[in-house]
Design a protein with these regions (language model features):
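P-loop NTP-binding site
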Residues: 1-190
Length: 190
């Protein structure tokens, strides 16, 4: 969090993705890290020089929760999807979906562009989470910020027990934009 950054006596600069390139160019020195919202991973990766580490909030959150390795494995399963496979896209909150919604519009579009496959989708939100997961080839879950740790671990355990790969939005998006490896470079233990 920004509070953690301040407590570490570091400097935090917050900008819109459209302001990133100009901000980086104006700094007297390179930042230690760029952290982005997953939805703009592609643009931020293009605007961030390769010698500056870059990751996303959802990847950091997954690392903090201790489940990043399994989510990375789940993201890599995207590349094994075939025509007709069913993907569950699950959100922990029940926000009002708008045009351009990440879960119901952007992720399916990115999956189609990345895989070239005709996939089918099921969407859940809030407390909804299917008991039977065998019908899915992949589960893509939000970061779970509105779910307590116990609920998120329960969902991951259900997927593991069913043998279904599970990933989160940020890790999946990084994989589909070809920047998963780059977004994980900040973690020496992966």
């Amino acid at each position: 969090t920004i509070r953690d950054i301040l407590d570490s006596r570091a400097i935090s600069i917050v900008v819109q993705d459209t302001e990133l390139k100009e901000t980086l160019d104006s700094l007297g020195r390179k930042p230690s890290l760029v952290i982005t919202d997953s939805q703009v991973f592609g643009r931020v990766a293009k605007d961030t020089p390769h010698d500056i580490p870059m990751t996303s909030f959802s990847i950091l959150f997954a690392r903090y929760k201790g489940n990043l390795k399994s989510l990375v494995n789940g993201a890599q399963a995207i590349d094994t999807l075939e025509d007709g496979d069913k993907v569950l896209i699950s959100e922990g909150c029940t926000h009002h979906r708008q045009c351009g919604d990440i879960g119901t519009e952007k992720l399916p579009n990115w999956l189609k562009q990345h895989t070239g496959k005709n996939l089918t989708y099921e969407f859940t939100s809030g407390t909804e989470f299917p008991l039977e997961l065998d019908q899915y080839k992949l589960i893509i879950h939000c970061g779970g910020c509105m779910l307590n740790e116990r609920e998120m671990k329960y969902r991951m355990k259900c997927a593991e027990d069913a043998g279904i790969p599970m990933t989160n939005y940020g890790t999946a998006i990084a994989n589909m934009h070809g920047i998963l490896e780059r977004s994980l470079e900040v973690f020496s233990d992966l």
